[in-house]
Amino acid sequence: MGYISNNNLINYLPLSTTQPPLLLTHCDINGNDHHQLITASSGEHDIDERKNNIPAAATLRWNPTPEQITTLEELYRSGTRTPTTEQIQQIASKLRKYGRIEGKNVFYWFQNHKARERLKRRRREGGAIIKPHKDVKDSSSGGHRVDQTKLCPSFPHTNRPQPQHELDPASYNKDNNANNEDHGTTEESDQRASEVGKYATWRNLVTWSITQQPEEINIDENVNGEEEETRDNRTLNLFPVREYQEKTGRLIEKTKACNYCYYYEFMPLKN
């Protein structure tokens, strides 16, 4: 009695190259069991059908074609800035022959185009206000010098000749170094002369103050005990007068008496 070896048993068994089918069991309302056999190939087919059922418009953006852009720009240049709902539908229906487009795409294109035009206009106006500095070529140095625009107006009384050291600093420094040696000896003599002049002026002021008589000042004491300083009013004496003072207590009264010897009286003429 012979036995079949394991190797011979494996050779007799058929080999399956496909995946085993899946058996799904579900129960309905009546309680009956239903069996459904699903294979791997049928599952892949169901996935492909689900992908095809997804709408393409929900996943794609609007990519305008050159023909659509050209048509929209022509409409904008012709005067269309904010189209109405009917105009948007008409424009979209005309542009669909060049590619996919919707009404909202037309509306947003006009809005964005107007915003870009406003931004460009503001940049041009801002560039016109702010002007760059002019580069003026300097013939003496051979380079360029930047001249800044004057913001304040010039007045006639402020226009004065510019000093030489401001016009040409190099030449002024050379002349200044040469003149310092010549003026070195004269500075001491000028200083001595100024001191002598100051001393003479001071001596004249002292002499003048001594020779001048101080003005007579009357100090009267009022009822409240306050002191007032009053000075004599200087008047032009047309006729010679004689002055005398009368002292009465603390008060000093000055009176002026007229000299009647020099008094003249003019009488009217008789016809």
Curated annotation (Swiss-Prot):
Keyword entries, A-Z: Developmental protein, Differentiation, DNA-binding, Homeobox, Nucleus, Oogenesis, Transcription, Transcription regulation
The text of the family note is: Belongs to the WUS homeobox family.
- Give the chief site where it resides: nucleus
Segment forming the signal sequence: none
May I have one GO cellular component term? primary endosperm nucleus
User: In which tissues has expression of this protein been reported?
Assistant: Highly expressed in developing ovules. Present in developing primordia and differentiating organs but absent in mature organs.
Organism name: Arabidopsis thaliana (Mouse-ear cress)
Where in or outside the cell?
Answer: Nucleus
Its BP terms in the Gene Ontology are: cell differentiation; cell division; embryo sac morphogenesis; floral organ development; leaf development; leaf morphogenesis; petal morphogenesis; plant ovule morphogenesis
Specify the DNA-binding region ranges.
57-121
Does Ribonucleoprotein appear among the keywords? no
Please give the SMART domains that the UniProt record associates with this protein.
Answer: HOX
Q: Does the keyword Membrane apply?
A: no
Q: Please give the name of this protein.
A: WUSCHEL-related homeobox 6
Bias (Basic and acidic residues) occurs at 132-148, 180-195
The UniProt function text for this chain reads: Transcription factor that plays a central role in ovule patterning by regulating cell proliferation of the maternal integuments and differentiation of the maegaspore mother cell (MCC). Involved in AGAMOUS (AG) repression in leaves.
> Which molecular function term from Gene Ontology is one that the record holds?
DNA binding
Q: Which SUPFAM superfamilies would you find in this protein's record?
A: Homeodomain-like
- InterPro entries xrefs: HD, Homeodomain-like_sf, WUSCHEL-like
Q: Where is this region: Disordered?
A: 118-195
